Amino acid sequence: MLKIKPPNYQFCPFCGKKLGIKIEEGKERKYCSSCHWTYYPRVAQATAAVIVRKGKVLLVHRKREPYKGTWMFPAGFVEFGEHPLETLKREVKEETGLMVKKALLMNIFQTKDDPRSPGHIAIFYRTEVLNGQLKNDDEENQNIGWFNIQKPPKIGWKNHQKVMKFLRKEVRK
């Protein structure tokens, strides 16, 4: 269980009254006695595309923190109202210029090494893409490239490291 505390809201976002505390399901919850709103902290969701071709994996080189200067799978946060598969398609297109052909759920992790939030849920998909020209997203990434699965560059996120380790074992079989 993560030990990061959620935001400390003082006032109700709906009616503006001062929030109190109530115990629900054995946990302290911020609560508005005026309009009966209860704050349930949530974690964000992200998707990541594991794209493998001919023993090589497609990675992007991070341009911003956290983990600036390290490599990762093309990934991004799920926006409100968006299905994780829609996020995957959007992020792959934005970060690589490629179009998703097929995606299969590979694994789900709770990220514990994101300093920006109380962790997030990372959904990894084994992803096939249509042939096309690689196009780097200069706003988010320094570079993009195909790497030998057995000799990847430095991977930043721990969950991305786990998936890369799995891929290396899978290729050895």
Go through each PLM region and give its residues.
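A broadly conserved sequence feature marking short terminus-proximal activation segments
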Residues: 1-8, 150-154, 163-173
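Conserved Nudix-box catalytic region and its N-terminal flanking loop in Nudix hydrolases
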Residues: 2, 52-94
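Acidic, metal-coordinating catalytic segment for phosphate/diphosphate chemistry
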Residues: 2-48
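A short coil-to-beta-strand element that immediately follows conserved catalytic motifs
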Residues: 22-23, 99-107
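Conserved hydrophobic "DFG−1" position in protein kinase catalytic cores
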Residues: 51-52, 59, 127-129, 146
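Active-site-adjacent beta-strand/loop module that shapes the phosphate/pyrophosphate-binding cleft
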Residues: 109-133
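NUDIX/MutT-family hydrolases
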Residues: 135-166
